[in-house]
């Protein structure tokens, strides 16, 4: 495989993992709605100039806009909402590991919605992912689950939504002539409108605060998440097959997020969490390579 493609995929994974981890700090300094509303607005400061100075923004026909909005809403609003809720109620390394099963659910989505033929390896990977999810939510020093049923489910739901959005709507739009930067612009605009609507409704009964410390984190994660991560990932896709790069991105994101949560947030995973992370990595790797 092209070594530059591997480098782009790994750096994209690091960028997104850093975004996931720093979001925990951002939510400690800023309200959820305020944080998620300003991030796409900040991202426009990077995406619009980049698009204007490179390939520009092109939309072959209006139908693609609707499909792109659907994928963007699923990814940037519904999926992000579940993930932010997950890291507020549980540790980042657990939430990120479950959310980063997105490549696995992307293959499932391709089978269900794009008509691709399922393989036995998909079901084997599903068992590994389920076992990994179980080990991730086991308390340190015990064999009991320390979270309610809904807490790990929110992070796993994030992975399902992200996997669907990255596979079905995105693939359809890009294969029908939409440029990557155009899809990226629609993604950010959809996020801005969605979270802006929520912010307007929320502000009627609650005062939304935008502290400078929180805005700095939001600006940083808008660059690493909405802009840099996507640019690097799309650059890697130009140099190698997506099926080759998916396990690199998915596995690396899980590993990077796990390590960064320990370094930056001082989380202390249990030994069961390490087992869970390994099982999920194997499951994602199997289904991405052989599925």
For each of these PLM feature ranges, what is it?
Residues 42, 47, 107-111, 120-140, ...:
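Hydrophobic transmembrane alpha-helices of multi-pass small-molecule transport proteins
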Residues 83, 103-124, 134, 254-274:
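C-terminal transmembrane-helix exit sites in multi-pass transporters
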Residues 42-46, 98-112, 190, 194, ...:
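Alpha-helical transmembrane segments of compact multi-pass small-molecule transporters, enriched
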Residues 15, 75, 102, 161, ...:
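MFS transmembrane alpha-helix packing/gate-lining sites
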Residues 149-182:
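Selected transmembrane alpha-helices and immediately adjacent juxtamembrane segments
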Residues 14, 18, 78, 105, ...:
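Residue positions within transmembrane alpha-helices of multi-pass solute transporters
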Residues 1-34, 38-70, 80-90, 140-156, ...:
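Membrane-interface interhelical linkers
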Residues 35-36, 95, 183, 245:
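Juxtamembrane helix-start motifs in multi-pass secondary transporters
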